[in-house]
Every structure is written in C-alpha cells, then in structure tokens.
Amino acid sequence: MKTTFLDFEQPIAELEAKIEELRFVQDDSVVDISEEIERLSKKSQQLTKDLYAHLTPWQVSQIARHPQRPYTLDYVSELFTDFHELHGDRAFADDLSIVGGLARFNGHACMVIGHQKGRDTKERAARNFGMPRPEGYRKAERLMRVAEKFGLPIFTFIDTPGAYPGVGAEERGQSEAIGHNLYVMAELKTPIIATVIGEGGSGGALAIAVADTVMMLQFSTYSVISPEGCASILWKSAAKAPEAAEALGLTAHRLKALGLIDKIVNEPLGGAHRDPKGTAALLRRALGDSLRQFQGMSVDALRERRFERLMAYGKYKETTARA
C-alpha cells in the first residue's frame, strides 16, 4: 500500500516521489541510476529522522490518527493466535466499535479487548468510527468477567476519539457504563495490561484502560479532550488546535514524565503505519515483559499493587517558598 503522507511530511513525500519516479525509469533505462536512488533514499531517511525528532504535540496527534496506522485487529493478527471473537453485551446489542475475544499470547490463554475504527467508509460507519456506545463498554465488561472467572490475563488496546455522545447512547446510560467499567477494572482479580495504540480520547479510552500496566506507543496520544474540542471551548476556534495540543500535554513522553503511564513502546522510523510488522514485534516484547511481571503474583498482591498505583495519581509535594 502506498504511504499517505501528512501535511508536515511534504518534504519527505516529494523525495519519495522522486525516488519512485527514478525506480520506474530504471526499469526501462540502459543507464545505471541505482547510486542516485540510493543517495536520495538516504537523504529521505535522514530527513525523516530529523523531522520525527522534533515533532510538536499537534503533529503527534496527526500521526496517532493516521488512516494507515495499525488498529486493534491488525495487532491481534500479528501478536495473538487462536483468536475467537465474542459478541454482544447480553442486554441490548453488539457494538462493533469494541472488539474482543479469547486468544493465545506466546502460547498462554488470554482475553483481548480493544477499540476498532474501520478502514473504509462502510466499515467506519459500522464501527461508529471507533466511538463506543454503552453496549460496547458493557460487552467489554462481560469479557473481563469471563477472563476473571478463568484466571486469564487481559490485554486491552485503546484507540478512540472518545465515547459516542449521541442521544441514544446517553439514554442507555453512557456515563454509567463508563463509570461501572472503571469500578470493575479496579477490582478485577486478574492482570490487566493496557496499551494506547492511537488516540486515547477521554473517558471513552479510560473505560478499558484501568490496568496494572499502561503503555503507549511512541506516537499515540492520551487526553481528556481532543485538541480541536479544547480549542473550540477555550478559544472558540478549532484553528487553535496546535496550541491546545501543546497545553493538553497529550504525548507519551509528557505523560510518562508525569507518572501517568508506565512505559513507552518505540515505533519504527516514520511511525507505526510505515512498518506495522516492526511495530508489532516491538509491542510483543513489551507485552511479554509486562505479563511476566505479574505471573506468580497472588490476587491480593495484584489488587493491592493496582490500588496503590491508582491512588498515586494526583499526588503533590509542598515546598517552602523563599522570601
């Protein structure tokens, strides 16, 4: 698949277009231009390194939303075997914006749950663009209870702009469904490992992200509101989204520095969409390391550790001001 370049990547896009043109010409040319292709390829790689080393929070937000970025089901196919999807909340409907089911990770049985946005227009509409309704969160809770019953570790993958704010969703108890999941996940008697793989949008993300370990891919985001939403409220204009992204502190490195997440999983050069398999390999290692940390831990110790982790959020330190 041809890479889609973002607006701020246009210098890279122009170089890649030249390289592609030269490769096309080389097929029918008697002149060897392989050295020129190699020179431009190295230049493109260095330009990508330089650009990605100084990304703004707004640019990171754009990468997190990239249309070719791997979604939950892409990681399921790369990281897990014997995946068997489970459907429905047993109360109202099956919300396709959240997927989940039984699987094996490195040979160990587990439960996998995550947001799913969809690739084309038809699938995006069917999956509500990755914005869950209450039945999606209740399905997730049902699968978590199954995992708890059989002592299976839970892996969750977060990638949503937020919970769906429609009238029907509110009528069916959207806030209650989210709040109930927070309560349930805090008390579950089995390990939970959450990874933000794209957008981590507010309560819609948090409802499957209360965990023993929370990780973020390098170019994912996690925030109480989208930059556009924040800009519309504070400045009455979505055009201020870059400033809002800076103020929100939504990048993985900022959140790690604040102690709100536990680990950052690096992405290949140019982001996960450039090398999905390479990203999956890095994520597999991180998930395996996290899971080993909890193997053999008693239920009481696991829950106590989770409680202490949650209670550590929002701590502050008093200092004596100098005159």
Curated annotation (Swiss-Prot):
Start and end residues of each CoA carboxyltransferase C-terminal domain: 39-293
Chemical reaction(s) catalysed: N(6)-carboxybiotinyl-L-lysyl-[protein] + acetyl-CoA = N(6)-biotinyl-L-lysyl-[protein] + malonyl-CoA
Gene designation per UniProt: accA-1
Pathway: Lipid metabolism; malonyl-CoA biosynthesis; malonyl-CoA from acetyl-CoA: step 1/1
UniProt-listed NCBIfam families: accA (TIGR00513), AccA_sub (NF041504), PRK05724.1 (NF004344)
EC assignment: 2.1.3.15
Annotated InterPro entries: Acetyl_CoA_COase_a_su, ClpP/crotonase-like_dom_sf, COA_CT_C
Main location (coarse class): cytoplasm
Recorded GO CC terms: acetyl-CoA carboxylase complex
Listed GO MF terms: acetyl-CoA carboxylase activity; ATP binding; carboxyl- or carbamoyltransferase activity
Compartments in which it is found: Cytoplasm
Assembly notes: Acetyl-CoA carboxylase is a heterohexamer composed of biotin carboxyl carrier protein (AccB), biotin carboxylase (AccC) and two subunits each of ACCase subunit alpha (AccA) and ACCase subunit beta (AccD).
Deletion consequences: Remains resistant to thailandamide.
Record SUPFAM superfamilies: ClpP/crotonase
PANTHER family: ACETYL-COENZYME A CARBOXYLASE CARBOXYL TRANSFERASE SUBUNIT ALPHA, ACETYL-COENZYME A CARBOXYLASE CARBOXYL TRANSFERASE SUBUNIT ALPHA, CHLOROPLASTIC
Pfam family, one: ACCA
Role played: Component of the acetyl coenzyme A carboxylase (ACC) complex. First, biotin carboxylase catalyzes the carboxylation of biotin on its carrier protein (BCCP) and then the CO(2) group is transferred by the carboxyltransferase to acetyl-CoA to form malonyl-CoA. Does not confer resistance to the endogenous polyketide antibiotic thailandamide, does not confer resistance to thailandamide when expressed in S.typhimurium.
Family per record: Belongs to the AccA family.
Name this protein carries in UniProt: Acetyl-coenzyme A carboxylase carboxyl transferase subunit alpha 1
Key words of the record: ATP-binding, Cytoplasm, Fatty acid biosynthesis, Fatty acid metabolism, Ligase, Lipid biosynthesis, Lipid metabolism, Nucleotide-binding, Transferase
EC top class named in words: transferase
GO BP: any one term: fatty acid biosynthetic process
